[in-house]
Swiss-Prot record:
Phylogenetic classification of the source organism: Eukaryota, Metazoa, Chordata, Craniata, Vertebrata
Alphabetized UniProt keyword annotations: ATP-binding, Cytoplasm, Kinase, Magnesium, Metal-binding, Nucleotide-binding, Phosphoprotein, Serine/threonine-protein kinase, Transferase
Species name: Gallus gallus (Chicken)
Enzyme Commission designation: 2.7.11.1
Places the protein is found: Cytoplasm
Tissue expression profile of the protein: Ubiquitously expressed in embryonic tissue.
Protein name, UniProt field: Serine/threonine-protein kinase SIK2
Post-translation changes: Phosphorylated at Thr-181 by STK11/LKB1 in complex with STE20-related adapter-alpha (STRADA) pseudo kinase and CAB39.
Residue ranges annotated for the Protein kinase domain, each copy included: 26-277
Molecular function terms, GO-annotated: ATP binding; magnesium ion binding; protein serine kinase activity; protein serine/threonine kinase activity; tau-protein kinase activity
Stated family: Belongs to the protein kinase superfamily. CAMK Ser/Thr protein kinase family. SNF1 subfamily.
Length: 798
């Protein structure tokens, strides 16, 4: 008996958006990966709301040997129950298709993590290797050999814990009965496999463990080559390089695992007792504790009564569930049991982790506090049951994913069918409601306020949201890779006062139209908090045209793997890949474009632009309250009242000054006196009026420019802006740099009747008025405090 996956009773969210495809009780969300005869989909269980990975296999494309291998993989996964091994939840089979529902690891492969972030520290590698070793030892204790251990098959869950996956090459073994199948990945394969000899399964896995540990610590492969014969020769020789940063204990452990003779190779028990592994004794205790917490050995009759009670409350027959667990049926009953058990563990761990309040966490409700204080055995099922009835948004699946799903597997999923047990109608016999009403899971007002499940929904809408307690270093390429199917990133560029803040802020990534305004508002709010009133928004197309970094070339038609060109086959360090270099090049390119091309020291004006943009609003408010400012006319563009600079931007004024400073590089200097009179005449003011205006204005001294002694400039709060004729005479860039090195800043306490003079060293000087002590005290608080002998001229060195 089969039924169509699309349920007509569930209304579509909109007329334009197609309904989500379903396989049994699972709503298909997106594609995780594709193969020659299989495709892996990300799905969500409709009852437990748990994300799972469904491997959909087209049996018509498999020969009998490969089909036997698939069945053996399912048989192996049914026997394995370990915290660091991917769990099997359900197996569904039709005439042509096979659906394998397994645990979903949210953080992907260890290979991608190393490619993005570089090699691990030895302490972090030790923690990960303990988890890997525990999983492999568990397999060997059940007489199962993996035979394909590599970083691509080591997945990372939401807590960055190891999950061993892909038992496609796994097999059962007996002690003393060697295996002979050539399988696995060549860089991780043992010498006996390259030689075509029979081998012991555990010895093969130990060699692969040595290669995995080397990759974790070094970020590259110990054995590599341009072709298979070269790689084979290097593996048979057993020679590899040890980097300078690897400790001696780690080196000895890897060398004992990578021994060419399998009989002399170290065993798992000896690995656990090695000095490098025992450097942190707490890790071994954590492994034993985490393994003891796995409390479902269902086929042995060890059931979780609390989970069974929750299922019975939901209307699922308890007796049918127990029978499915005893027979290892892995049907809908067993899948709901296993998924509910995982949800219960997550709920308990979240209650424990939410006890220490943080700045981002909201105050828990009284019911949550009471549940957290209760023992685990006495935890009621009402809270978890209500969370299971939380309604998911109907617009979870993007139209592009739906279109992609329509063409997968040469239409084996059109329409998608799933098998149903003949006695399935007794599943909800203890409930007065219909199955469709249970699947629709109506929302109650109490459940709407469950913050944990709201966070879970937000985590799905933004799958790469980085928690604050993690140490992962996500690059811009990784962000772009995960969102190539959604809206392009909106990158906000602002004038920051601190150079350490970088040039670009975090990307405002939106995955749906409902969240776009919220994400954009939060990003802009973050810019306002940094004190940047003027921000320049740049689209992804502009970034792609301005930056040479290939990582910014967003290609929506390509998958995530296309943006990770670096592989261990190329023999490069993961930390030295183009991902990190691309991000650095992007920031350097933006800084380079923001700099002025010309005289030495012109780039210092960028610091002035940032300082003006950051503190203009606060300084204007303080200047408006100053009695000195009230007594002055609004005649300059930097006046606090802003009457003469309406419609003009501060940043534009600074850029205008940059252009003025680069004019007339070939003219000779003229005498100081004619230039002074010309300056006053050009401004339309007589010399006396010019001097009087300068006396009445205050100035802003940039201490940063004075310290560098490269470009001295004094701007008054109400002083006149330097005009282009100020720079009518100049010298070449080379000669100006030479004069700059010999120039001494000239500050005099004498009051000068003119506004600008020229020194005899061919350096341009702008003269500012003197101030008395009372006026200086009431001036701008950001003005540098000058002593009595420093009041007077301000020299502009060019």
């Amino acid at each position: 008996m089969v039924i169509m996956s699309e349920d007509a009773s569930v209304p579509a969210p909109s007329a334009a958006q197609p309904r989500p495809l379903r396989v049994g009780f699972y709503d298909i969300e997106r594609t995780l990966g594709k193969g020659n005869f299989a495709v892996v989909k990300l799905a969500r269980h409709r009852v437990t709301k748990t994300q799972v990975a469904i491997k959909i296999i087209d049996k018509t494309r498999l020969d009998p040997s490969n089909l036997e291998k698939i069945y053996r993989e399912v048989q192996i996964m049914k026997l394995l129950n370990h915290p660091h091994i991917i769990k099997l939840y359900q197996v569904m089979e039709t005439k042509d298709m096979l659906y394998i529902v397994t645990e979903f690891a949210k953080n992907g492969e260890m290979f991608d993590h190393l490619t993005s972030n570089g090699h691990l520290s030895e302490s972090e590698a030790r923690k990960k290797f303990w988890q890997i070793l525990s999983a492999v030892e568990y397999c060997h204790s059940h007489h199962i050999v993996h035979r394909d251990l590599k970083t691509e098959n080591l997945l990372l869950d939401a807590n960055m814990n190891i999950k061993l996956a892909d038992f496609g090459f796994g097999n059962f073994y007996k002690s003393g009965e060697p295996l002979s199948t050539w399988c696995g990945s060549p860089p991780y394969a043992a010498p006996e496999v390259f030689e075509g000899k029979e081998y012991e399964g555990p010895h093969l896995d130990i060699w692969s463990l040595g290669v995995v540990l080397y990759v974790l610590v070094c970020g590259s492969l110990p054995f590599d080559g341009p072709n298979l014969p070269t790689l084979r020769q290097r593996v048979l020789e057993g020679r590899f390089r040890i980097p300078y940063f690897m400790s001696e204990d780690c080196e000895t452990l890897i060398r004992r695992m990578l021994v060419v003779d399998p009989t002399k190779r170290i065993t798992i028990s000896q690995i656990k007792q090695h000095k490098w592994m025992q450097a942190d004794p707490s890790l071994r205790q954590q492994q034993s504790l985490s393994f003891s917490m796995q409390n479902y050995n269902s086929n042995l009759g060890d059931y979780n009564e609390q989970v069974l009670g929750i299922m019975q409350t939901l209307g699922i027959d308890r007796q049918r569930t127990v029978e499915s667990l005893q027979n290892s049926s892995y049907n809908h009953f067993a899948a709901i049991y296993y998924l509910l058990l995982e949800r219960l563990k997550e709920y308990r761990s979240s209650q424990l982790s939410s006890r220490p309040a943080t700045g981002r966490q909201q105050r828990p409700r009284s019911s949550e506090i009471s549940n957290a204080e209760m023992p685990q055995d006495s935890l009621t099922s009402e809270t978890l049951r209500s969370s299971l009835l939380y309604q998911q948004p109907q617009s979870l699946i993007q139209p592009s994913l739906q279109a992609e799903m329509d063409c997968d597997m040469n239409n084996p999923l059109q329409p998608v069918f799933f098998p149903v047990d003949p006695n399935f109608n007794g599943l909800f016999r203890n409930r007065s409601i219909s199955p469709s009403s249970l699947l629709e899971t109506t929302i109650s007002e109490e459940v709407r306020q469950e913050k944990e499940l709201e966070d879970e929904i937000k985590a799905y809408d933004h799958p790469i949201r980085i928690p604050s307690n993690t140490s992962r270093r996500h690059t811009l390429a990784e962000v772009t890779t995960h969102f190539y199917q959604h809206a392009p990133p909106c990158i906000v560029i602002s004038s920051s006062a601190s150079p350490t803040e970088g040039t670009s802020s975090d990307s405002c990534l939106t995955s749906s139209s409902n969240d776009s305004s919220v994400a954009l508002s939060s990003c802009l709010a973050g810019q306002v908090m940094t004190g940047s009133p003027a921000t320049a928004r740049m689209t992804s197309a502009f970034l792609a045209s301005q930056s040479d970094a290939p990582v910014l070339q967003v290609q929506g038609c390509m998958g995530g793997a296309s943006l990770l060109p670096v592989s261990f086959q190329e023999g490069r360090r993961a930390s030295d890949t183009s991902l990190t270099q691309g991000l650095k090049a992007f920031r350097q390119q933006l800084r380079k474009n923001a700099r002025a091309k010309g005289f030495l020291g012109l780039n210092k004006i960028k610091g002035f632009a940032r300082q003006v943009c950051q503190s203009s609003s606060s300084r204007a408010a303080r200047s408006a309250m100053s009695p000195f400012q009230h007594a002055q006319p609004n005649t300059c563009i930097y006046s606090s009242s802003g009457s003469s600079r309406e419609g003009r931007n501060l940043l534009e004024e600074v850029l205008q000054q940059q252009r003025m400073l680069q004019l007339q590089h070939h003219q000779l200097l003229q005498p100081a006196c004619p230039q002074t009179s010309q300056t006053s005449a050009t401004n339309g003011l007589p010399p006396s009026d010019s001097a009087g205006t300068c006396k009445a204005s205050n100035s802003l001294l940039l201490s940063e420019l004075q310290r560098e002694n490269s470009f001295e400039l004094a701007f008054g709060g109400n002083s006149q802006l330097l005009q282009p004729h100020f720079f009518g005479v100049s010298v070449s860039p080379v000669s100006s740099a030479a004069h700059l090195l010999d120039t001494h800043l000239y500050i005099s306490s004498n009051v000068s009747p003119v506004g600008t003079t020229f020194s005899q060293q061919q350096s341009f000087s702008a003269q500012s008025p003197s101030y008395d002590a009372v006026t200086l005290q009431h001036g701008d608080c950001e003005m540098e405090d000058l002593t009595s002998n420093q009041l007077g001229k301000f020299v502009l060195v060019k």
